[in-house]
Structures are given as C-alpha cells and as structure tokens.
Amino acid sequence: MLWRTTNIFPKRLCFGSQCNMLCRTTFALARLPGLIGRWFDERLALMRKGILGIAAVSVALLTSLTACGDDNKDSGGGGAKIGVILPDSKTSARWETADRKYLRAAFDAAGIKADIQNAQGDKNAFQTIADQMITNGASVLMITNLDSGTGKAVIQKAKSQGVTVIDYDRLTLGGGAPFYVSFDNVKVGKLMGDGLAKCLTDKKAVNPIVAYLNGGPTDNNATLFKNGYDGVLKPKFDSGEYAKGPDQAVPEWDNTKAGTIFEQMLTGTPNLGGVVAANDGLGNAAIAVLKKQKLNGQIPVTGQDATVQGLQNVLAGDQCMTVYKAIKLEADAGAKLAIALARGEKGEANSTVDDPEANAKVPAVLLEPKAIFKENVNDVVADGYVTKAELCTGEFAKLCADNGVR
C-alpha cells in the first residue's frame, strides 16, 4: 500500500542535458503511481525482495538527480557565481603570481565560488572564456581587457544576459561597465616622472635627453601612465631644462619588441640621459641593451609594478625606481565589489574616472601607488608582495643586506 499513498518522486528532477534520459524515465514512472501500486499489491507476497531492490534503485535515481541539480550551487554564496578573466602572463608577472593568488584567497574566504581564468593574450580565447562563464551561470564578470574592443564585446554580451561586469585594473573605453577597480594610474605615471627627475638630479645631469618607452598603444592604462609622467616632464622640456628624445609605444607591452625599439632609440640618440619605461618589463629590456654598451647604471631608467626583477634592478642601481601597487589591496577591493554585486547588494565606489569614448564618468574604486627607490625596497618585502627569499638570491643577497631588506 506504500506505493499508493507515498509519492517518492520529486516535482523537479532534472537540470541539464546529461540527465534527459534519466529524467524521462523517472517522470514516466511518476505518472503511473496507480498502475505501479496495483502491480505491487497483486504480487506483494512474491515480490518483497523486488520491492526492496526497486526502492534501492529509486534512492540511487534521486541521489543522481540531486547531483544534477546542484552542479552550479555555491557554498555560502547564495547561488551566485563570479567569473574572472585575467589578460595574459606576458605583459607582467603579476597576473599569475599575485592577482590570481589574492583573488582566489578573497573568494574562498567569503565562501563564494569563482572561476578564474587567463586568456594568455588571445582575443578569441578571451571571448570564449567569457561566453562559457555566462553559460555556466556567472552573475558577475570581472575582466582585465586585452584591449577596449575585446572588452566591449564581452560587456555587451554580458549585459544582454543580465550579467554585471567590473573592469579590473584596465578601463574598457566605451564599454559601459558599471564599475572600475584599479590604482590611480595617472598618479602611477606621475610617480615615474617625479622619480626620473629625482634620479637625474642625483646624477647632476645637465640638459639630459629623455626617451619615452611607453606601454601598449591599445591599453588605456598606458595612456594614463603617459599622461602622468608627461605632466611632470613636459614643463621641463618646454623650459629647456630637459630635451625631449625618442617617444614610442611598445605593442602589447612585449618585452622583446621593447628591446628592439630601445636599441634603435639608443643607436639614433647615443647621448640619451634618461628613460621613462612604462613598467619593469620594458625597463629591463632597456637595461639589457644598456648593459651591452656598458651604460647600465649611468642612464636612469624607470619602471613600475615592483616585480622581483624590477626590484633587483633597483638594488643593483640599473633601474632608478619602480612603483609599487599593492596588488593584494586591488584584488581584495575587486573581490569585495564582485561579491557584493553577486549577492544582490549595492556596489560602492570611492571615486570616478572619465571614459572619454563614452563621454561618461565611471564609478571607481581607486587605490594609491607608492614610489620605490633603493632605500625603501624593504617596504615591498615587509608588505608580503615579494619575499626576501625570492628577491635576495645570489649576488643580490649582499645588496639586500646593504639596503636594509629584512
């Protein structure tokens, strides 16, 4: 009689194509409780073992169906999912060594399921990853675009599916993302300009010719960095205190291309007095060229990102300074905003930035960068961004000790 009075079949059984056959079979059984009940009544005496066997199968069916339905459920996240797309591993080591690590820790601490992937500089892969994340149920995407065109395509697709997008570190011009999380990138550039001026003053340089080795031409951050350092150095060019030298962007922030470009700069202007390199990778490319001419340490070179390589170049005196951007703070801020939006809460910004292509102000969470010279390299180590063990290897052990790296 159990089969006449008890409905063991749930109302909602299937979630996904892999369950289709199982679901059709189970629903067919669910529609015939009376028939099943009569069948078992007539054969109750003979089929007790059979009933137990079918009951066991029913439990197995229900367990399998439950697993199908819970594939996308987040622990502690109210069902929300967050997708993060990092740009590459080539333009800077930070994306894999810092951003991924800190973002993962922040999401795990909040109990939010997040999918963090890297497009490895491939525009098609970037779009494919975004499509997969949306299909898999992400309610928030946090992207670091490869260029504004790639970013816009993802943002438009996400909007059409009701998915919120956060621009992380790089603003997608004309994209219309409702939030942007980054450092004050104009200030990053200003610190580079001020840093080069300090280094040239320390060297007592007279009318130095200054070259610009700018970042990728399609990266809005590269534009902001240049706005910052040009704001410091242009008045010096205009007054005649400094002379403006070669000025060239490096496609896709490619360090190999940067080396070639700078070699051509140095060949055409052998009396260069200083170099604004837009990050540590480009700076190291310039330093490698200068080493060939035994000019390293004589011509100040800037950078930013406070990479291990950049900090070692600073300690060695080959790079005059770098800019430390506390990536953990940026990752934590991005994760906090993404989690709030995924939970249906209102996101909070502390500033706005201009999107000249959209002629709009974008709500932003902006963080403060810090200039790093030889004397305060330890600040980066003390903050945990790099370790003494990875920085102070081989020949750099003594340089670390001499400069107070603990």
Language-model features: locations:
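Extreme N-terminal basic, low-complexity initiation segments
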Residues: 2-9, 13-14
